[in-house]
UniProtKB/Swiss-Prot annotation:
Keyword Transferase: yes
Protein purpose: Serine/threonine-protein kinase that may function as a signaling receptor of extracellular matrix component.
Gene Ontology biological process: cell surface receptor signaling pathway; defense response; response to bacterium; response to fungus; response to salicylic acid
Protein name according to UniProt: Wall-associated receptor kinase-like 10
Protein kinase domain boundaries: 433-718
Stretch forming the signal peptide: 1-24
Species annotation: Arabidopsis thaliana
InterPro entries, alphabetized: EGF_Ca-bd_CS, Kinase-like_dom_sf, Prot_kinase_dom, Ser/Thr_kinase_AS, WAK, WAK-like, WAK_GUB
Subcellular location field: Membrane
């Protein structure tokens, strides 16, 4: 008896289900060209519940009955999105636009969209849009959130017109011009608060919402509109409030779902849950599953369904998720099997390869081709290697390699002082001149960090250009500089002449340059002591004194600046970058050259006369010494126009007895003021506008050594006192107008070498900066 009753109930349920499906199949499927899929429906018995009833007005305009809004489109949830976020169906409706002060009146607050208790809520892709001058709009019924935005019509911002207020405001400002007509939406700007503004909705299930336009600003007139929409608005289509007001409506995206309470509709679909499907996918057993449903009983008690991957159709009608034949349709218009046979599966496909003969033929052909290509490649490599060897010999000879070898052999006691590297050694040392090995770049060349086979770390300077007419002078200069052995001068270790331009190898200084330690933010507290700065000044002065006086031939550096002063791990200074240096014979006192140097460090007398003397290096050293005392940059746009260069700033401060005001705050409290004062007097003498009144580097070096040696009651060497003539001198400085223009400049510090054989002829660097 019990068994018969169960069978009867099952038969009755099946019959009712068949009847429901039959009725559903006879229901209208479209209204006004818009698809109406189940659970939505038109007419009694054609929809799942009252929430989903669609009324087709005049057989052309569909309305969602429960909220009386025109329907634009209905779609199901996206299955692919479900594995990252809960997917919902989408129904787009037309919602009234709130307006104020427009030509034909309007709704001041708009109509309230209330879906409380319904299986609908606002999608998170909707935005609040407000259009019009001085329009402040906000959302209502979104407590505790406060959502709103304000649009203005201020024209104070200096932006291109095609990024301003769109075509309407372009015409209002410039008249009906062709330029305004040609504004392209490709160059348009999203609503940014000028003419129109936008605001995002609260990130939660919002079922009741309204739009309000603030009317407290009585002085602001003109049409203002505000609305919620899922469409994107730019200045070109969102800057005409009258046009938007005339439209009356805009589209809003609602998300819909199925209530799971009090009915077994979802269970009758035969769909798998997301959790079940995830387990099946893990075991590769997901094929054949047509639809999926996601349940949430903890918050709103809803369920959403979709067809699984490889299926399409309506998941809310049993059996309506149909398999996609990928072998016929392909994926994104492309065939799924480029080789072999495509076999369609329920929810997927596979590619079968049954005939192996083409594969064997293909492999044999490929192997033969590879052997042939390998032979050609080996022959190519052999010929290329021979060409490279011949090219290296050619470069070595052209770059003066034979002359250098001869001079190194005939120079007694200096045969091993300079090494001639081959190109392979330097390529290996720098990982084939890898970009990761670059230490710095300038107009003259690029410096790489390298490690030789003996473990020494070196700086490898690869020049950009070469003057072939001065290669002999270059070789002579290499020999001269290689003989310099001073602890405060970066050592030239050797060169490579097998490349198209000579490559120079210097010792590597690991601790950066003085500029970085003085002016860049750093955790190094060593530079906060006056003793370290004074020692650096002594080191620099000693190196320049050696170059000017003690070297076999006097050498003028010509580009002394803080970026060319390297610091080793013990913060001992080493002078670097001889790219513009010049040697002079003992019977000459100056060089006439093309002006080259760095703004802020350049001798003004040299700038005027183009005659570089040893006193020009003294001037540049004076600027560096002033940097050490003040901590200021040689050129700073933070200072006023008259004090823009440090030389002017420092000299005027010294004349006005304001030394204590300009001492670097990092050393002011811990320094010995008598030492700083003595050093400042030397810096002032070095910065004298007339070169003949400056001390020599030898005098400067001796005086700084004396300052460093005596800490109390010292009496530094006094130079001739300033006279009235100096006070009448007009400061001649390198003009610095702005951050973007400098009258004379030079490349950043790199290692390089250049020479001259005449003291009166115009000379340019071998590697121009």
């Amino acid at each position: 008896m019990s068994s018969n009753c169960s069978c009867s109930l099952l038969s009755l349920f099946s019959l009712l289900l068949i009847i429901d499906l039959t009725v559903a199949s006879s229901c209208p499927k479209t209204c006004g060209g818009i698809d109406i899929p189940y659970p939505f429906g038109i007419g009694t018995g054609c929809y799942l519940e009252k929430w989903y009833e669609i009324i087709c007005v005049n057989n052309s305009v569909p309305f969602l009955s429960i909220i009386n809004r025109e329907v634009v489109s209905i779609s199901f949830s996206d299955m692919y999105r479900r594995f990252f976020n809960v997917g919902y169906g989408s129904i787009r409706i037309r919602n009234p636009i709130a307006s104020k002060g427009c030509s034909s009146g309007g709704q001041e607050f708009g109509s309230l969209l209330n879906m409380t208790g319904y299986p609908f809520y606002l999608g998170d892709n909707n935005m609040l849009i407000a259009v019009g001058c001085n329009n402040t709009a906000s959302l209502t019924n979104v407590e505790p959130s406060i959502v709103g935005c304000e649009s203005t019509c201020s024209t104070n911002q200096d932006i291109p017109i095609n990024d301003y207020l769109g075509v309407l405001y372009c015409n209002a400002r410039y008249g009906d011009s062709e330029y305004c007509k040609n504004i392209s939406i490709m160059n348009d700007t999203s609503c940014n608060g000028i003419g129109c503004c936008k605001a995002s909705l609260p990130a939660r299930y919002q079922q009741i919402i309204g739009v309000e336009i603030d009317d407290s600003n009585t002085e602001s007139k003109g049409c203002k509109v505000a609305f919620i929409t899922d469409e994107e608005y730019f200045l070109s289509n969102g800057s005409d409030p009258e046009r938007l007001h005339a439209n009356g409506y805009d589209t809003v995206d609602l998300r819909w779902f199925i209530h799971t309470a009090n009915h077994s509709f979802i269970g009758s679909l035969g769909c798998k849950s997301i959790d079940e499907y995830t387990i099946l996918r893990r075991d590769n057993r997901e094929y054949g599953i047509g639809c999926l449903c996601d349940y949430n009983s903890t918050t709103t008690g809803y369920a959403t369904c979709s067809c699984a991957s490889g299926f399409e159709g309506n998941p809310y009608i049993p059996g309506e998720c149909k398999d996609i034949n990928e072998c016929v349709r392909g994926i994104d218009g492309n065939p799924v099997c480029t080789a072999g046979k495509c076999v369609n599966l329920l929810g997927g496909y596979t590619c079968e390869y049954t005939n192996h003969r083409p594969l064997v033929i293909g492999l044999s052909t490929s192997f033969s081709t590879l052997v042939f290509i390998g032979g050609i490649y080996w022959l190519y490599k052999f010929i290329r290697r021979q060409r490279r060897l011949n090219q290296k010999k050619k470069f070595f000879k052209r770059n003066g390699g034979l002359l250098l070898q001869q001079q190194l052999t005939t120079t007694e006691g200096n045969v091993d002082s300079t090494r001639v590297f081959n190109s392979r050694e330097l390529e290996k040392a720098t990982e084939n001149f890898s970009l990761t090995r670059i230490l710095g770049e300038g107009g003259q060349g690029t410096v790489y960090k390298g490690m030789l086979v003996d473990g020494r770390i070196v700086a490898v300077k690869k020049s950009k250009v070469v003057d072939e007419d001065k290669l002999e002078e270059f070789i002579n200069e290499v020999v001269i500089l290689s003989q310099i052995n001073h602890r405060n001068i970066v050592k030239l270790l050797g060169c490579c002449l097998e490349t198209d331009v000579p490559i120079l190898v210097y010792e590597f200084i690991p601790n950066g340059n003085l500029f970085e330690h003085l002016h860049d933010d750093s955790d190094d507290y060593t530079m906060t002591t006056w003793e370290v700065r004074l020692r650096i000044a002594v080191d620099i002065a000693g190196a320049l004194s050696y170059l000017h006086s003690a070297a076999s031939s006097p050498i003028y550096h010509r580009d002394i600046k803080s970026t060319n002063i390297m610091l080793d791990e013990k913060h001992r200074a080493k002078v670097s970058d001889f790219g513009t240096s010049r040697t002079v014979t003992v019977d000459h006192t100056h060089l006439t050259t093309v002006v080259s140097g760095t703004v802020g460090y350049m001798d003004p007398e040299y700038f005027q006369s183009s005659q570089f003397t040893d006193k020009s290096d003294v001037y540049s050293f004076g600027v560096v010494l002033a940097e050490l005392i003040t901590g200021e940059k040689s050129v700073s746009f933070l200072r006023s126009q008259e004090y823009r260069t440090l030389a002017t700033y420092f000299t005027l401060a010294m004349k006005e007895n304001r030394l204590s005001d300009i001492i670097d705050a990092r050393i002011r409290d811990g320094c010995k003021l008598n030492q700083v004062t003595a050093a400042a007097k030397i810096a002032r003498k070095c910065l004298n506008m007339k070169g003949r009144k400056r001390p020599s580097m030898r005098q400067v070096s001796m005086e700084l050594e004396k300052i460093r040696s005596y800490s109390e009651d010292m009496q530094p060497y006094e130079y001739a006192s300033e006279n009235e003539e100096e006070k009448k001198e007009t400061l001649v400085d390198v003009n610095v107008e702005s951050r973007n223009y400098v009258s004379v400049t030079a490349a950043s510090s790199q290692y390089s070498i250049a020479t001259t054989s005449s003291s009166r002829s115009d000379v340019e660097p071998l590697f121009p900066r």
